[in-house]
A protein has these predicted regions:
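Bacterial Sec-dependent N-terminal signal peptides
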Residues: 1-33
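Intrinsically disordered, low-complexity sequence elements enriched in Ser/Thr/Gly/Pro
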Residues: 2-6, 69, 216
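Extracytoplasmic cell-surface/polysaccharide-interacting catalytic and binding patches
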Residues: 28-117, 132, 136-212, 218-239
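Segments that shape or occlude catalytic/ligand-binding pockets
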Residues: 122
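Aromatic-lined carbohydrate-binding/catalytic grooves of carbohydrate-active enzymes
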Residues: 126
Length: 239
């Protein structure tokens, strides 16, 4: 009887060990698997049924007087490639666009306006960027995806409404040096004040500043799906 109990115990222990060791690769694969990305417009529509604020909207439908300079629709960017075909439309989640509208309203009282360089960015574009610059300080690792892919991040600056000129921020867009960092302080007071104005008004309205890029801000809630949908599909549904 004792032998039977011992044998059962040994078999049970063996099964436990085998199960544990065979589970390790599965957990490892899950940890290192590619992120889930929505590529079909129909699946995107399903994803926002439970939350209408997830809707992707053309930014000017929410903030009509905002300015665009969509760099990735030109060759004037770090890739030196025209990534987007359309330079007149860009998109964000509805909740994020509304928050940006509040920022714009506050700045307009100072005769200032936001200028948008980039907003929604398809996941496949992030993959191309990563091929050129594998540095997470400046380009999102596709294994994680980015706020741009989720429709909740925006690259922007401030301009004077009267002149149309950008406020001096010390560097241009896509400057991958320490000078572009939020914590870089070896700059004239005018530049520091301009950066502080942008950061303050964005954070006041629910955005978080990226430490390595003074122009990059993302929404405080990242619980949004990664998207790899051509912007022209959103464009067809502009209300």
């Amino acid at each position: 009887m004792l032998n039977k109990i011992t044998n059962r115990f040994n078999i049970g222990l063996l099964v436990t060990i085998i199960f544990s060791t065979t589970s390790l690769p599965i957990l490892y694969a899950q940890k290192n698997s590619e992120p889930q990305v929505i590529k079909a417009y129909s699946l995107y529509k399903q994803s926002m049924k439970s939350d209408s604020l997830k809707k992707m909207v053309e930014l000017k439908t929410i903030v009509p007087n905002i300015r665009y300079d969509l760099r990735y629709a030109t060759v004037n960017n770090f890739m030196h490639q025209q990534v987007y075909k359309d330079d007149s439309h860009t998109f964000l989640r509805l909740i994020v666009a509304r928050a940006l509208g509040r920022v714009q309203q506050e700045l307009s009282e100072k005769n200032l306006s936001l200028k948008i360089w980039d907003a929604y960015r398809p996941y496949s574009v992030t993959e191309k960027m990563w091929e050129l610059i594998k540095d997470e300080r400046y380009v999102a690792d596709p294994k994680k995806g980015s706020g741009h892919n989720r429709g909740i991040a925006v690259d922007l600056t401030i301009i004077d409404i009267t002149t149309g000129k950008e406020l001096n921020m010390g560097t241009g867009f896509d400057n991958f040096t320490d000078t572009a960092h939020q914590t870089f302080k070896n700059l004239p007071p005018e530049i520091l004040n301009n950066r502080a104005l942008l950061k303050t008004v964005m954070e006041k309205n629910g955005f978080i500043a990226m430490e390595t890029e003074w122009w990059h801000f993302f929404w405080n809630n990242q619980d949004f799906e990664l998207l790899d949908i051509d912007p022209k599909k959103f464009k067809k549904n502009i209300n």
